[in-house]
Amino acid sequence: MQGASLMSPKPPLVLVHGLWDTPNVFRRLRQHLEDWPAPILAPHLPHKLGFTPLKTLAQDLELAIDEAFGPDQTIDLLGFSMGAVISRTWLQLYGGHRRTRRFVSLGSPQNGTLVHSIRYF
């Protein structure tokens, strides 16, 4: 976490990495946001090579946000790739929409992927 105190006029910014990524994917972005006037959180959400269920990752995201900022703090949320799908799942299924001011989805497969439509015999 970095940035100003929780009393900042801007809510904390939460960055959610994608599948086969870690919070390190946001390293350069965080360098550009060094003077950002609010805390920044980029939690690590282990996916176990893609076998961790999406709902579990969304619950892990909620735990990380609650641990960092408490359950009532409004946040801004940026999800990259599968991280945006995890974020959307948290917003829609776990009440994240009640505390999220803005949600930004970057490069995400919100409509699924080609691999998802392949049938296994």
Language-model segments: which ranges?
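Proline/glycine-enriched tight loop/beta-turn segments at coil->beta junctions
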Residues: 6-12
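Serine-dependent carboxylesterase/thioesterase catalytic core
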Residues: 13-19, 23-24, 33-34, 39-51, ...
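Short amphipathic alpha-helix
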Residues: 28-29
